[in-house]
UniProtKB/Swiss-Prot annotation:
A cellular component term, taken from the record's GO annotations: excinuclease repair complex
Biological function: The UvrABC repair system catalyzes the recognition and processing of DNA lesions. A damage recognition complex composed of 2 UvrA and 2 UvrB subunits scans DNA for abnormalities. Upon binding of the UvrA(2)B(2) complex to a putative damaged site, the DNA wraps around one UvrB monomer. DNA wrap is dependent on ATP binding by UvrB and probably causes local melting of the DNA helix, facilitating insertion of UvrB beta-hairpin between the DNA strands. Then UvrB probes one DNA strand for the presence of a lesion.
Originating gene: uvrB
Pfam families in UniProt: Helicase_C (PF00271), ResIII (PF04851), UVR (PF02151), UvrB (PF12344), UvrB_inter (PF17757)
Residue numbers covered by motif Beta-hairpin: 92-115
Helicase C-terminal domain ranges (all copies): 431-597
Family: Belongs to the UvrB family.
Domain writeup: The beta-hairpin motif is involved in DNA binding.
The protein, known as: UvrABC system protein B
Biased composition (Basic and acidic residues): 600-609, 618-628
Domain (UVR) ranges: 635-670
Residues in Helicase ATP-binding domain copies: 26-414
């Protein structure tokens, strides 16, 4: 393990990259707080940032506007820094229905959610890494501005173990339960521990492949060992190990009991207010709900919706911002805002939407006023907490340009020599028929096509129409979850279908070199989806292909269209000059089609885990290499195998059930590895 970033790449900076890297690093070292990197599609923005990270050697937080792009960036940074700690921090909810009240119909909607355990583990790993390593790079979404447990509590609760240290076994077990670990003697799962004589096995909450064995003798720690929880194979012996809490929201018993007292005081004040306003129903409701939560906290240290009491648990004053991922960052860190023209407005919008929903809950007696402090950061609070920053975008917004005070570094020349797509304008009247003929031409060449429409209805109708005419087409919309969205993009690249239709999901950062045509329907309808920035971003999706072309269907030239075409032409001219000067022949970008969540694999670790698992005896027949499968495929396969296993067991076909059980174990091992 090293505490220095080591960039691994088969190529060196070229084109505008060397000058951009030098300028960004020089500005950072000079103490410049904000700067902007204006990089066109395919110019190597991620690679440029990776070079900056290696040169400045600071812990780095990269913020992306959505989970799809965050996953892509995570994979790229994992491949650039295979020997360093690259982590992923996004919302761990697969499904989330927030608590809400609709006064007009007197409807209360209970909070309902489904947590993705794997992403929860990655979040815990990210915070542990930020607190313990300098060579940490975390890729996050706006989830980073939402409340977490205070880092002071998180650090004060950790359990530090050293070989030779004297520790009472009961005290050790009590400390693990304070960290919210659960005792499970039958199955060692993540966030659990088991006791066998003087041996304790702990599966750390932030780990997915390694568990810790603590061997005691006469009250002393005799040995600390990391082992594979699946096979029991010893991986390595340690002199020292730190066990971190199972959740970011863990807190001490004293803090919890203190919070109970302050919540009671707030409840008393709030009830007096409600009674004085003659709101008897609201007062009764609030007293009943809060008393129940207080009893749960006093007895078990936890209650449903405990995050609504986070102000009391962290000891913050009313109105103070909650602790977030930014509190885990060291003060000398680097912040990179990717696709800043989208991410920055997102950060500003989060607080307002959350506030309006919670004010209704407080007004009608569902929550105490302190629930308003369980919130994302306000924009000005986020600004105050942000370390030195680099805004990255092909179309920086006015905020980024203003904050950078003119320090805009351009990355216009592509090392591949690729020039920006040719932009053509065609009439709206025949747009669908014209599009079909263009699609057929591209399919003959083995290329892919992106089509953007203005409305969901139009996208659905167009998808149906193209499908009826024998074109393999899919429709990408907001109802599709993150993992499936990534799968659709991957299937497009693999050629499982040729045309992808969408509305606003085909813009920022998606890396699809196989796409040679982007069609923008109704391009002359001025608005958010057809602004200058949106048009430049959408046109840019075809910029990674040698035959890249963008067709704008419009009956009149709008100001946004003219500005987008002028900017595209400017970039084309600069690239053509560079190609002539350096004798470069443009060639399409070639990028392997892998699961973007996988990143780089550690070959040594893979061999080691493979070796260990081959020792264990299985009933299963030879099965395919599950490690080549994607997370969504693994999840689907697991579900199907489990159903078959239970059916065989029900039919008393135990050998068949045992074979499937072992396939499931291999599949789970592959998803962890």
């Amino acid at each position: 393990m090293t505490d220095r970033f080591q960039l691994v790449s088969p190529y060196s900076p070229a084109g505008d990259q060397p000058a951009a890297i030098d300028k960004l690093v020089a500005n950072f070292e000079a103490g410049l707080a904000k700067q902007t990197l204006l990089g066109v599609t395919g110019s190597g923005k991620t690679y440029t940032i990776a070079n900056v990270v290696q040169q400045v050697q600071r812990p780095t937080l990269v913020m992306a506007p959505n989970k799809t792009l965050a996953a892509q960036l995570y994979g790229e940074f994992k491949s650039f820094f295979p020997h360093n700690a690259v982590e992923y921090f996004v919302s761990y909810y697969d499904y989330y229905q927030p608590e809400a009240y609709v006064p007009s119909s007197d409807t209360f909607i209970e909070k309902d959610s489904s947590i993705n355990e794997h992403i929860e583990q990655m979040r815990l790993s990210a915070t542990k890494t930020l607190l313990s390593r300098r060579d940490s790079l975390v890729v996050a979404t706006v989830s980073a501005i939402y409340g977490l447990g205070a880092p002071e509590d998180y650090l004060s609760l950790r359990l530090i173990l050293s070989v030779g240290e004297h520790i009472d076994q009961r005290q050790l077990i009590r400390h693990l339960t304070d960290l919210q670990y659960t005792r499970n003697e039958f199955e060692l799962t993540r966030g659990a521990f088991r006791v066998r004589g003087e041996v304790l096995d702990v599966f750390p909450a932030e780990s997915d492949t390694e568990a810790l064995r603590i061997e005691l003798f006469d009250g002393d720690i005799e040995q600390l060992t990391l082992f594979d929880p699946l096979t029991g194979e010893t991986l390595r012996k340690l002199q020292r190990y730190t066990v971190y809490p199972k959740t970011h929201y863990a807190t001490t018993r004293e803090r919890t009991l203190s919070a109970v007292d302050t919540i009671k005081e707030e409840l008393k004040e709030r009830l007096e207010q409600l009674y004085s306003q003659n709101k008897l129903v609201e007062a009764q409701r609030l007293a009943q709900r809060t008393q129940f939560d207080l009893e749960m906290m006093a007895e078990v240290g936890f209650c449903n919706g405990i995050e609504n009491y986070s102000r009391h648990l962290t000891g913050k004053a009313p109105g103070e911002p909650p602790p977030t991922l930014f509190d885990y960052l060291p003060p000398d860190a680097l912040l990179v805002i990717d696709e800043s023209h989208v991410t920055i407005p997102q950060i500003g919008a989060m607080y307002k939407g959350d506030r309006s929903r919670k004010e209704t809950l407080v007004e009608f007696g569902f929550r105490l006023p302190s629930a308003l402090d369980n919130r994302p950061l306000r924009f000005e609070e986020w600004e105050a907490r942000s370390p030195r920053s680099i805004y990255v975008s092909a179309t920086p917004g006015p905020y980024e340009v203003r904050e950078s005070a003119g320090e805009v570094t351009e990355l216009v020349v592509r090392p591949t020599g690729l020039i920006d797509p040719v932009v053509e304008i065609r009439p709206v009247g025949t747009q669908v028929d014209d599009l079909m003929s263009e699609v057929h031409e591209r399919i003959k060449l083995g290329d892919r096509v992106l089509v953007t429409t203005l409305t969901k209805r139009m996208a659905e109708n167009l998808t149906e129409y193209l499908g009826e005419h024998g074109i393999r087409v899919r429709y990408l919309h907001s109802d599709i979850d993150t993992v499936e969205r990534v799968e659709i993009i991957r299937d497009l690249r693999l050629g499982k279908f040729d045309v992808l239709v969408g509305i606003n999901l085909l813009r920022e950062g998606l890396d699809m070199p196989e796409v040679s045509l982007v069609a923008i329907l109704d391009a002359d309808k001025e608005g958010f989806l057809r602004s200058t920035g949106s048009l430049i971003q959408t046109i840019g999706r075809a910029a990674r292909n040698l035959r890249g072309k963008a067709i704008l269907y419009a009956d009149k030239m709008t100001r946004s269209m003219q500005a987008a075409i002028d900017e595209t032409d400017r970039r084309r001219e600069k690239q053509v000059e560079y190609n002539l000067e350096h004798g470069i022949t443009p060639k399409s970008v070639e990028r392997p089609i892998a699961d973007i969540m996988e990143g780089a694999r550690d070959d040594a670790a893979e061999k080691k885990s493979g070796k260990g698992r081959s020792k264990s005896r299985h009933v299963a027949e030879e099965t395919p290499d599950y490690r080549a499968m994607k997370p969504a495929e693994i999840a689907g396969k697991l579900k199907s195998l489990e159903q078959k296993m239970y059916q065989h067991a029900k039919d008393l076909e135990f050998e068949a059930a045992a074979q499937i059980r072992d396939q499931i174990q291999k599949l789970k091992a592959a998803s962890l590895g």
